Regions:
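N-terminal Rossmann-fold NAD(P) dinucleotide-binding loop
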Residues: 148-149
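Oxidoreductase and adenylate-handling cofactor-binding alpha/beta cores
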Residues: 88-107, 153-160, 285-299, 334-338
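Rossmann-like adenosine-cofactor binding region
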Residues: 43-45, 163, 167-260, 275
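Phosphate-binding beta-alpha-beta segment of Rossmann-like dinucleotide-binding domains, i.e.
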Residues: 80-138, 299-304
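A conserved regulatory-domain signal marking ACT and ACT-like small-molecule sensing domains
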Residues: 301, 305-386
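Glycine-rich Rossmann-fold phosphate-binding loop(s) that bind the pyrophosphate
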Residues: 144-145
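An N-terminal-biased, well-structured beta-alpha scaffold segment characteristic
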Residues: 1-79, 212-214, 218, 224, ...
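Rossmann-like dinucleotide-binding domain for NAD(H)/NADP(H)
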Residues: 213, 221-313, 357, 386
Length: 386
């Protein structure tokens, strides 16, 4: 029986993927083996020795102390793509709403309540909210992952010319893209051509302030910028300067901050990207499945701090070892198994930066002290025997 602690409300459809005869959901557990989390900040949350894995029902893991988890042999999962449709739909809606000035128009229309001259005032006032159609305009998409590819394809369907920039595009994402999406080798190739610009990359130290004074200077005057990925991807100070100069006509984002609120030309939604029932369910189901497969079988899929390693069970016992990605690690592991007269039926080893994961199926008499012996080798971080 595994104990799972939830730090946020998790869709019951997702929790149903953790059968009650194998998993206990205890939100007050002091020593859980797994944690399910959405947006709760875990940086000040103690990580008990019992904890084997954290599954984030969402894509970003900024709220999780990933490095500390890695050092303790705790696997951190996320759910890439589970909320992609929800975010992509919101971006398309923001493209339309922003271009046609719908937010300001709706707010203005509300001020007409109680007047006897509403029809007349509407005809007179609507000219203040005239905005361009999307058809025939050019959209630049930075990042062509699950969300960016969907946005690009939707924009093509709306009749836009779509330019894409992603030096790390995956094969799956490339296959999913419309042939009409034009590939740009550099931002310099793309930015001067865009009427609209949207960014869809993960937040990393290397992507912080991707939209900055330098990149904005490359854009054509009057560009409309959208950010439904992470607030830190845009340098707000540079963005506000560009708004004041007319370089940027509008900034539509999902991350309100004190400096952005109330600024003319800025539309902020309250982090609605994944806020749909379908998205929450998809993320919860995926997170629960990842957590279950790891706890029961040692398989890792969609981890942010360890390599993806998965293999079917072939009988016997399974040994799961998180260790330093260092020379001699595999030799040390197999030497101990040989001394224990265990036969390796199947083995997978993969590394990810400084850490590696080895999954072994063995036959023979697995004694209680095997995990202790394996854990004593210098490269070992954490050992489980299933």
């Amino acid at each position: 029986m595994y104990t799972i602690k939830t730090l946020n409300a998790i869709s019951p459809v997702g929790l149903a993927k953790l059968p009650a005869n194998q998993f206990e959901i205890d939100n007050e557990a002091a020593a859980p083996q797994g944690i399910l989390v959405r947006s709760a900040d875990m940086h000040d949350t103690p990580l008990p020795d019992s904890l084997l894995a954290i599954a984030r029902a969402g894509a970003g893991t900024n709220n999780i102390p990933v490095e500390d988890c890695t050092n303790k042999g705790i696997v951190v999962f996320n759910t890439p793509g589970a909320n992609a449709n929800a975010v992509a739909e919101l971006v398309v809606g923001a493209l339309v709403a922003g271009s046609r000035n719908l937010v300001d128009a709706v707010n203005w229309a509300q001020t007409l309540k109680g007047r006897d001259t509403i029809a007349k005032d509407v005809e007179k006032g609507k000219k203040a909210f005239v905005g361009p159609e999307l058809r025939g305009k050019t959209l630049g998409v930075i990042g062509l992952g699950a969300i960016g590819a969907r946005v690009a394809n939707a924009a093509v369907a709306l009749g836009m010319e779509v330019l894409g920039y992603d030096p790390y595009i995956s094969i799956d994402a490339a296959w999913s893209l419309s042939r009409s999406v034009q590939h740009c080798v550099t931002l310099g190739d793309m930015l001067p051509r865009c009427d609209y610009l949207t960014i869809h990359v993960p937040y990393l130290p290397t992507t912080r302030h991707t939209i900055n004074a330098q990149t904005l200077a490359m854009c054509k005057d009057g560009v409309r910028v959208l950010n439904f990925a992470r607030g830190e991807l845009v340098d707000n100070a540079a963005l506000l300067d560009a708004l004041n100069s007319g370089k940027v006509a509008q900034y539509f984002c999902d991350f309100p901050t004190e400096e952005l609120l109330g600024v003319k030309g800025v539309c902020c939604t309250p982090h609605l990207g994944a806020s749909t029932p379908e998205s929450e369910t998809n993320c919860a189901v995926m997170a629960a499945a990842e957590l279950s497969d790891f706890l029961k079988n040692g398989n890792i899929s969609h981890s942010v701090n360890l390599p993806d390693v998965s293999q079917p069970r072939v009988g016997g016992r399974r040994i799961c070892i998180i260790h330093k990605n260092a020379p001699g690690a595999i030799s040390a592991i197999t030497s101990i198994l040989t001394e224990a007269h265990l036969n390796i039926e199947n083995m997978v080893n993969k590394g990810k930066k400084d850490v590696a994961y080895t999954l072994l199926d063995v036959t023979g008499n697995v004694t209680d002290d095997l995990a202790v012996k394996l854990g004593a080798i210098e490269p070992a971080i954490r050992v489980r025997v299933l």
